[in-house]
A protein has these predicted regions:
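An amphipathic, aromatic/His-enriched active-site/gating alpha helix that lines ligand/cofactor pockets
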Residues: 23-41, 49, 59-97
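Active-site-flanking beta-strand signature of metal-NTP-handling nucleotidyl enzymes
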Residues: 3-11
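Long, low-complexity, Ser/Thr/Gly/Pro-rich intrinsically disordered segments that act as flexible linkers
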Residues: 93-107
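Intrinsic disorder/low-complexity detector
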Residues: 1-3, 91, 101
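Short, surface-exposed ligand-recognition loops at beta-strand->loop->(often short) alpha-helix junctions
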Residues: 11-23
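A short, glycine/Asx- and small/polar-enriched loop/turn
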Residues: 50-54
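Short hydrophobic/aromatic beta-strand micro-patches
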Residues: 11, 57-59
Length: 107
């Protein structure tokens, strides 16, 4: 059974401190864990105040658990949209790249 890993490369918004970036990443991590993600992994690339970046990974146990998370969104998109609207009012990180990977164990 394939595990699903959503991966985003994030760049800081000009003028945002590392502390502000970390605070936002903690909010995102808390949100995705509450939504049912198996785990969230955050990796820092370079120094956050000197053109650094972040890798933000949302891990799902299986395709079914990833699908359940997507179904949750479509059942009540307003709750998700409200959270995103809050984050957009104080932009801290820009998503430079995003991908969904399927980790297949039987190959």
């Amino acid at each position: 059974m394939a595990r699903i890993i959503e991966t985003a490369i994030l760049n800081p918004v000009e003028g945002k401190t590392r502390a502000q970036q970390v605070a936002r990443l903690k909010e995102w991590k808390k949100h995705w864990l509450a939504e049912g993600a198996d785990k969230v992994v955050v990796k820092e690339l370079g120094a956050g105040n000197i053109g650094g970046a972040w890798i933000f990974e949302i891990h799902h146990k299986s395709g079914a658990s990833y699908g359940a998370l997507i179904d949750t969104y479509y059942k009540n998109p307003k709750s998700y949209d409200d959270v995103v609207a809050k984050w957009q009012k104080t932009p801290t990180l820009n998503i430079a790249s995003y991908a969904v990977a399927f980790e297949v164990e039987d190959i």
